[in-house]
Amino acid sequence: METRATLRGVRLSVDKGRLVADLIRGKKVDQALNILQFTQKKAAVIIKKVLESAIANAEHNDGADIDELRVKTIFVEQGASLRRFTARAKGRGNQIRKPTCHVYVTVGN
């Protein structure tokens, strides 16, 4: 039994998200939440919310026991980049790319 939760279009770079996702892959859910709580990264807060959503989905939809759940898969994929322009000298402009990503978490026995 597997349950998924996704979060799309997060204002976070893929590399920073994957750094935190690698910390909890394959761990028990309570251990993963503990790791995320004490990790001082912006990505940890975002991934913790998605993980809590996946746990709630498993409990509500499938009646799963929380003590037996593990983080089966977690991956962070690249989303569309937001493009912004900033003014430069002599009437020119430079492009600023603000990356987004998609977070996918699957929990199961």
Curated annotation (Swiss-Prot):
Q: Which GO terms describe its molecular function?
A: rRNA binding; structural constituent of ribosome
Task: Please name every pair of cysteines joined by a disulfide bond in this record.
Answer: none
Do you know which Pfam families this protein is assigned to? Answer: Ribosomal_L22
Going by the UniProt record, its keywords in alphabetical order are: Ribonucleoprotein, Ribosomal protein, RNA-binding, rRNA-binding
Q: Which residues form the signal peptide?
A: none
Entries under InterPro entries matching the protein: Ribosomal_uL22, Ribosomal_uL22_bac/chlpt-type, Ribosomal_uL22_bac/org-type, Ribosomal_uL22_CS, Ribosomal_uL22_sf
Highest taxon listed in the record's lineage: Bacteria
Biological process according to GO: translation
Identify one Gene Ontology CC term for this UniProt entry: cytosolic large ribosomal subunit
Q: Briefly, what is this protein's role?
A: This protein binds specifically to 23S rRNA; its binding is stimulated by other ribosomal proteins, e.g. L4, L17, and L20. It is important during the early stages of 50S assembly. It makes multiple contacts with different domains of the 23S rRNA in the assembled 50S subunit and ribosome. The globular domain of the protein is located near the polypeptide exit tunnel on the outside of the subunit, while an extended beta-hairpin is found that lines the wall of the exit tunnel in the center of the 70S ribosome.
Q: How does it assemble?
A: Part of the 50S ribosomal subunit.
- Family statement: Belongs to the universal ribosomal protein uL22 family.
This chain belongs to the protein called Large ribosomal subunit protein uL22
